[in-house]
Regions:
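Zn2+-dependent metallopeptidase catalytic core
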Residues: 94-122
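A short glycine-rich, hydrophobically flanked beta-strand micro-motif that places a catalytic Asp/Glu
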Residues: 123-127
Length: 200
């Protein structure tokens, strides 16, 4: 906050608004899944202790959403079923209106992957409701956050149950200029095959 081009660099001080949000963990933890370095997942490190050890052992479990079928029998037969609790991402109301349909489509396109795993309507994008009791900083709501900044980047912090790796909530934060970064990547990576990329 006190370096670079940020306002605090000139004044030497800044006022910061902080938010703390606490949520109860599920009474029954989700079944954890051990991490495999051959597959790319974010991980929770685990240190194991037991009476039989002379030294602790280390491992990791993957971070993932808890998707449970509403109709287990249908799911076991290999038929698509909706989850008990779908993954819902809200669109930050500060998002430029032009991009909202594309962000919603990008989230909803993930349903193709979830259908391959047996779930339909597993992930949903919604516009932020006009509800004064809801807060973008509330740990109960996953949000696609828009950050009006010249930074060319995006990131995705998550709140995860440390016992199981269950993702309780996630924010996908994208800076305004991330589109310029994507354009550069596309030009470099696809330029040899896509003539449109050669003239970007």
């Amino acid at each position: 906050i006190t370096s670079g081009k940020l306002p605090a660099a000139a004044t030497g001080s800044v006022t910061v608004k902080l938010n703390t949000s606490m949520v109860m963990l599920p009474k029954e933890p989700m079944q954890p899944r051990l991490a495999d370095e051959r597959v790319g997942f974010f991980q929770n490190p685990v240190t194991e202790f037991s009476d039989e050890q002379q030294v602790t052992s280390r491992g990791a479990i993957i971070q993932r959403y808890r998707l449970e079928p509403k109709d287990p029998e249908r799911y076991r037969r290999g038929q698509l079923t909706e989850p008990k609790r779908p993954i819902v991402y809200y669109i930050d109301p500060a998002t430029p209106k032009k991009w909202i349909p594309y962000l919603k489509a990008g989230v909803n396109d993930w349903n193709v992957a979830f259908e391959a795993a047996g779930f339909k309507n597993a992930i949903i994008a919604k516009e932020w409701p006009d509800d004064p009791t809801m807060s973008l900083d509330d740990a109960r709501y996953s949000v696609l956050r828009y950050l009006p900044s010249e930074t060319e980047n995006a990131y995705g912090p998550r709140i995860v149950d440390p016992r199981s790796g269950e993702i309780m909530e996630s924010h996908i934060c994208w800076y305004h200029n991330v589109m310029n970064l994507l354009k550069k990547w596309y030009m470099v990576q696809c330029g040899p095959l896509d003539k449109r990329a050669q003239s970007m």
